[in-house]
Amino acid sequence: MDHYDSQQTNDYMQPEEDWDRDLLLDPAWEKQQRKTFTAWCNSHLRKAGTQIENIEEDFRDGLKLMLLLEVISGERLAKPERGKMRVHKISNVNKALDFIASKGVKLVSIGAEEIVDGNVKMTLGMIWTIILRFAIQDISVEETSAKEGLLLWCQRKTAPYKNVNIQNFHISWKDGLGFCALIHRHRPELIDYGKLRKDDPLTNLNTAFDVAEKYLDIPKMLDAEDIVGTARPDEKAIMTYVSSFYHAFSGAQKAETAANRICKVLAVNQENEQLMEDYEKLASDLLEWIRRTIPWLENRVPENTMHAMQQKLEDFRDYRRLHKPPKVQEKCQLEINFNTLQTKLRLSNRPAFMPSEGRMVSDINNAWGCLEQVEKGYEEWLLNEIRRLERLDHLAEKFRQKASIHEAWTDGKEAMLRQKDYETATLSEIKALLKKHEAFESDLAAHQDRVEQIAAIAQELNELDYYDSPSVNARCQKICDQWDNLGALTQKRREALERTEKLLETIDQLYLEYAKRAAPFNNWMEGAMEDLQDTFIVHTIEEIQGLTTAHEQFKATLPDADKERLAILGIHNEVSKIVQTYHVNMAGTNPYTTITPQEINGKWDHVRQLVPRRDQALTEEHARQQHNERLRKQFGAQANVIGPWIQTKMEEIGRISIEMHGTLEDQLSHLRQYEKSIVNYKPKIDQLEGDHQLIQEALIFDNKHTNYTMEHIRVGWEQLLTTIARTINEVENQILTRDAKGISQEQMNEFRASFNHFDRDHSGTLGPEEFKACLISLGYDIGNDPQGEAEFARIMSIVDPNRLGVVTFQAFIDFMSRETADTDTADQVMASFKILAGDKNYITVDELRRELPPDQAEYCIARMAPYTGPDSVPGALDYMSFSTALYGESDL
């Protein structure tokens, strides 16, 4: 027998005597069951277009009973008998009972004859059996089913509601709030639950029954007055009515789930269709953009001007910078959308997406490849055209510049070559004209290259198809014709000048000699003036001595320079003598130089004035450098004494801290006297600071007389003061440790001797191995076995808690003092608390306040945990855990 059968047999399919007793004991239950079961049957029979009025009469022929079973089971029963005789009715009822039995239901004491005879008790029992099998048995909530499942379902659904506590199917429903809570949980818009009152059960019940009938299609199976007027409502009636709620709401839940599933499928489908549409549109737009862009990139019509080509290049850059990047993003997004769409279709068991013809990703990639190929060709064409136009513009500008320079140079040259100025010129003028003409011929020859370059540029412009070639050719031809004419005129003038050259050669030679000697001498004077007026910046006596030596050497050259000046002036005087002798027209000036005798004399006088000024400046600077050198020596002498003194004191302090003798008080007194002697040295430091200030004011940046800088001295002095203070502090701490721990002076000396013995590098600290050897020498049994290593690790954790890898003397003293002195421990404190507590394992607040000072008592009360031992009393405190926490063996 399955779970339903056993449950049904044990709980509801009671023997006939029990049914009689139930009916006799409480007729109200029979009334409730009649109404409830009738309404339940009609809720199903109406689907077949019929109903019952009297439950014990309308099922007597078995026809409506068979119809009811067909409706609620969804199965066809055996064909009923249509006769009116008793045997036909019994046959139909038996068919119905057989069908019920075929569903695994045991029918106890229910026979067809009783049903046909209209036995109310048997008829109600049979209907209840049908309700159990077809309305309640299939209810399953978590691990429970049937009645327990229905009860659990009710409890879960009504759990959030106040004043509702469903524990059974009788009195838990009397106030009507349970029915209202079930409706509100699933259809909150149907009932205003907040307005219901527990003390108004009739209103609550009628509200629930009316709403269920009107909106949930659940007929009224119960009377509110019967439920309220009955001490214990009929359980079967309540279960039947509640099961209708379960099936109504479970059906709605299934419909909602089905609708959600359909919506989800449709949403996926709609999303996929939208992605397909987006892909098609994006692909179409991208291909259209490529189709429009390629002809623009294939347009290779060259421009005549650089401005026009640069505009094309700027348009192309705008295309690359502004127009193409969004399309690149669109192409990337298109591929992403395509892959995403295919993945979604595959995951949702949909066929793969096939884009329209010509819009495949491969088609877009091919079109994009064509675009980039054309784009690359267009860019190369643009750059080549720009380079060509740049070359043309450069050549055209070069042609214009060279032509303009040449034309400016030739301007007036023909008129100059045609003039007859040499006919009335003096000897010097003829010589000058001849030299000038020679210079012109040289200049003319030099310009030959420019003319050839102009012609070559014009030829290249023609070959490169320059748009303004006609004007270039016309200008070039004009320049060439003019050049030929200049050559002919130049030759004619040379011949005329050479005829008169010898007449004025002597004067010309003198002028030339004057120019050759005047120019170097003039340059020498200008250089001398620059040197004499040049400012100097020196930092040493050697540098100023070098400048003084150079100046003396310069003054030694002045007599020879004066002789050269007189010789140059003599040449000028000789020319004047010749002019006066031969009455030569000397209206012109020396053609070889612009330097006049007056200029030479003026510069010579200026040089003579600058020499004594330079002497004075060098003398003053020499005195300043001597003063600076004295400052250097003065600072160096003091620094060379103070620096080693500081170093010596540092070494002595280090030695004193290691090799201390006598009592700690003697050592402290000695160190303080030593500190006083160091402090008394401060005036010498201050004096050195004053000398350093003078050096800085004199802008002296180096000092060869010492390797010590003021910064070195300051740092050393501060380190010295810090070291002596730290050493004094260490001795003071040792005194505190000795006094606190009761260590004798002999023990302290022994500890110091052992520490210094193993501090072989005199660093003031011991490494792990040195410390271990020191402990062994003091009698500690620390072997190399695991136990010894563990003990040494424990000791190291005490003396080196920060894991620095070294042990200071103070840490060594602290450890040795703990090992040798009689110190208080957690056990001693616990023993003291036990005395105060009267030998109990706990202590009370009153005992603490009675035995300890108020502040210390409150301190203990605030931090002691409650005592939880078997002998605990109210207010007992745990002094043991408190004692261990004081020594870090547990947490406070």
Curated annotation (Swiss-Prot):
Family the UniProt entry places it in: Belongs to the alpha-actinin family.
Protein name: Alpha-actinin-1
Start and end residues of each stretch annotated as Interaction with DDN: 274-733
Function: F-actin cross-linking protein which is thought to anchor actin to a variety of intracellular structures. Association with IGSF8 regulates the immune synapse formation and is required for efficient T-cell activation.
Keywords on record: Acetylation, Actin-binding, Calcium, Cell junction, Cell membrane, Cell projection, Cytoplasm, Cytoskeleton, Membrane, Metal-binding, Phosphoprotein, Repeat
SUPFAM superfamilies on file: Calponin-homology domain, CH-domain, EF-hand, Spectrin repeat
Principal cellular location given in the protein's record: cytoplasm
Residues reported in the UniProt entry to bind Ca(2+): D759, D761, S763, T765, E770
Per-repeat ranges for Spectrin: 274-384, 394-499, 509-620, 630-733
Domain Calponin-homology (CH) as annotated: residue spans: 31-135, 144-250
Sites bearing N-acetylmethionine, chain numbering: M1
Residue positions where N6-acetyllysine is found in the record: K95, K195, K676
GO cellular component terms, semicolon-separated: bicellular tight junction; cell leading edge; dense body; focal adhesion; inner dense plaque of desmosome; lamellipodium; lateral plasma membrane; outer dense plaque of desmosome
InterPro entries listed in its UniProt record: Actinin_actin-bd_CS (IPR001589), CH_dom (IPR001715), CH_dom_sf (IPR036872), EF-hand-dom_pair (IPR011992), EF-hand_Ca_insen (IPR014837), EF_Hand_1_Ca_BS (IPR018247), EF_hand_dom (IPR002048), Spectrin/alpha-actinin (IPR018159)
A GO BP annotation: sarcomere organization
Organism: Macaca fascicularis
Gene3D superfamilies: 1.20.58.60, Calponin-like domain, EF-hand
GO MF annotations, alphabetized: actin binding; alpha-actinin binding; calcium ion binding; protein homodimerization activity; vinculin binding
Claim: Repeat is one of the keywords in the record: yes
Chain positions with Phosphoserine modification: S6, S471, S677, S890
Residue(s) carrying Phosphotyrosine: Y12
